[in-house]
Design a protein with these regions (language model features):
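Radical SAM [4Fe-4S] cluster-binding motif and immediate context
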Residues: 1, 213-367
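Radical SAM enzyme core and accessory elements
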Residues: 5, 9, 17-25, 31-43, ...
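N-terminal [4Fe-4S]-dependent radical SAM core
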Residues: 38-40, 186-234, 606-611
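A structural motif corresponding to the C-terminal lobe/cap of the Radical SAM core domain
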Residues: 45, 287, 299-302, 306-315, ...
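Short N-terminal binding/cap micro-motifs at the start of the first secondary-structure element
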Residues: 49-55
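Proline-aspartate-enriched helix->loop->beta-strand connector
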Residues: 97-101, 273, 401-402
Length: 615
């Protein structure tokens, strides 16, 4: 009888889908309830669409491996972005009708997640909400007090904790429904914070770390990650104790088995994944581990996949540098945290970096012209004022990295910097990402100036679109920092920070700045601006300040007619006629010389066109 009723109910669901969706959320939800399935939703709110959240995929994969096949539970992953409308995410979660919702929390999404935590209980009052991630692990008590409808927080490493929670929810269904012995059950689960029957927040001890090799590979369905960055983990923990960083808290450094790593990297190579970003905090902290992986990707290079690593440059040895120098241009890119060149600051934040060694190694890698190097500085660190930061900037800028990122101190809960904030006189924002406003050594006014300089560096250096012009312009100033400081002041003066600008607009502002800063030599910069402009693209809307192209139509026609026959410069254009070659290249007369820009063949590091001087 029960079976017949269930079948009839299912038929009613199929025949009356609209009515069921209106009254119960959706058809799938009703079907699951009839089958007595607990639906678990792991939600990630990413900063951008191209990002993926490794954490939620690892939680799901580990739980399924640990618990085995379980017909009474279904785990689904939903990834959103902070750029989506709030209502769109709210509605999507409601339609999925989860019994248990787990949300991955970070600096960049915690404000957004906070709004979800306020509204979701109103529309899904019976849903259990669990949070996890670095943003909630070290301040669980305050968060649970702020959001009374949140069931609990998974603190620290989450795979084993999440699996145990699912086991408990599955085995103790009746107990949880009746509300009996809940405190007793939760008290035995390591790595969680929860609210007991009296409303008091209980923080259990952190859970011992797991064997990293036990975490399943999560990218079998690689098609789900098309056009997105793949994040990969070959180690967890960090051997260092930088006071501003949460990674220093996890002292249990462990590595995934190298043979397993190779097998998984080969999967990415076979599938020609564009980029794999290692999330290891210091990838090269163990030389044999780094060497084996770098050797493997070098020997199995598919000519397409790029691998991104965060490294300590001063730890690189000659053997590693030699191997790196032999790699295909663009095979790897290195992110190197310098943070400061002030030795007092470096010591105070517990870094072991030797700036002289770091500079030498960055230079050695630079000479290979095959690796994109991304160097970081942090403004707002102890004992680093405005003048000192300017010196740190000049020191790092002189290393000529492909990217120089100016960041601002984030005072993270759980970090040593958070504990010492009062001692350092650090004033920071209450809202995430808890960015510095001022310190004993740096005023808020100076922070504003540094933010303006940061934008100038981003536009005129990191874009790689003004390299010839900026290299020459630097000689007009006492230092690179002064140059960007002056350019920022000019932007401020003409109110250019208040509006957005096109690429051509940035060139025009820079030209105006040149005419004001070095009037007698401004015209000398036109050639450099022209070169920079056409290195990246065959610009159709030519800026007025460049004047007319010195190459006439007849000269261009004669060149391409000859090139079609002889292939003197465009050797890789076999099969292309002169009309096609003309579309894919550009001829320009710069400083009296005829220059050919080839957009089919670009530098793998900079993206700039190949350039030939036409004789």
């Amino acid at each position: 009888v029960k079976e017949r009723r269930a079948i009839q109910n299912l038929a009613n669901l199929t025949g009356n889908r609209q009515r069921n969706e209106r009254h119960a959320g959706n058809h799938g939800f009703e079907w699951q309830k009839l089958r007595n399935i607990m639906k678990i939703l792991l939600a990630a709110v990413n900063a951008k669409y191209i990002h993926s959240n490794l954490a939620v995929y690892s939680l799901k994969a580990y739980a399924q491996k640990k618990l085995g096949k379980n017909d009474s539970q279904e785990i689904e992953i939903a990834e959103y972005t902070i750029n989506q409308t709030f209502d769109a995410i709210l509605q999507d979660i409601y339609r999925k009708q989860p019994d248990l919702l787990g949300i991955s929390c970070y600096l960049w999404n915690i404000e957004y997640v906070g709004h979800l935590l306020t509204e979701l209980p109103k529309i899904l009052p019976d849903m259990k909400i669990w949070l996890g991630g670095p943003e909630v692990s070290y301040d669980a008590k305050a968060l649970l007090e702020r959001f009374p409808k949140v069931e609990g927080v998974m603190c620290g490493e989450g795979e084993e904790t999440f699996a145990e929670l699912l086991r408990v929810y599955d085995e103790k269904k009746e107990t949880f429904c009746a509300g009996e012995k809940r405190d007793e059950i939760f008290s035995g689960i390591l790595g969680i914070a929860y609210r007991n029957k009296d409303g008091a927040v209980i923080q259990n001890a952190f859970r011992p770390v797991i064997d990293l090799s036990a975490v399943p590979f999560v990218y079998q369905h690689i098609e789900d990650f098309e056009n997105r960055i793949i994040y990969y983990e070959s180690s967890r923990g960090c051997p260092f104790s930088c006071s501003y960083c949460l990674s220093s808290i996890d002292k249990c450094l462990r590595f995934r088995e190298t043979e397993l790593v190779k097998k998984e990297l080969q999967f990415f190579l076979d599938n020609k994944v564009p980029q794999v970003k290692f999330v290891d905090r210091t990838f090269n902290c163990r030389h044999d581990h780094a060497m084996e992986i770098w050797t493997y990707i070098h020997e199995h290079d598919n000519g397409i996949t790029n691998f991104h690593f965060e490294v300590s440059a001063d730890l690189l040895n000659e053997k590693e540098i030699t191997l790196i120098s032999r790699m295909r241009p663009g095979l790897i890119q290195l992110e190197i945290g310098v943070q400061s060149a002030n030795e007092v600051t470096i010591r105070e934040i517990n870094r072991t970096m030797k700036i002289e060694i770091l500079s030498t190694i960055v230079d050695k890698i630079k000479k290979g012209n095959n690796v994109h190097q991304h160097l970081d500085l942090i403004a707002g660190l102890p004992y680093e004022g405005y003048e000192s930061f300017g010196k740190s900037f000049d020191r790092v800028y002189a290393m000529q990295p492909e990217q120089l990122q100016l960041g601002f101190l984030k005072v993270l809960k759980g970090s040593v910097m958070h504990e010492k904030a009062q001692e350092y006189g650090i004033v920071y924002q209450d809202r995430a990402p808890y960015e510095v406003l001022s310190t004993k050594w740096l005023t808020y006014g100076e922070i504003i100036r540094l933010k303006q300089i940061e934008e100038m560096v981003e536009v005129y250096y990191n874009s790689g679109q003004f390299c010839h012009t900026m290299a020459a312009l630097e000689r007009e100033f006492t230092s690179a920092f002064c140059m960007y400081e002056s350019l920022a002041a000019y932007y401020d003066e003409i109110n250019a920070f208040a509006v957005s600008h096109s690429r051509i607009g940035r060139y025009e502002i820079l030209y105006d700045f040149l005419t004001e800063t070095c009037k007698e030599r401004a015209e000398e910069y036109v050639g450099r601006l022209t070169s920079d402009l056409y290195l990246r693209d065959n610009v159709k809307n030519r800026p007025a300040f460049l004047g007319e192209n010195g190459v006439t139509s007849d000269e261009a026609a004669a060149f391409y007619k000859k090139e079609e026959k002889e292939r003197t410069y465009l050797k890789s254009y076999e099969g292309y006629d002169r009309r096609q070659m003309r579309k894919m290249t550009h001829l320009e007369r710069i400083d009296g010389k005829m220059i050919l820009f080839d957009y089919k063949n670009r530098d793998p590091l900079t993206g700039n066109a190949a350039v030939y001087e036409v004789g």
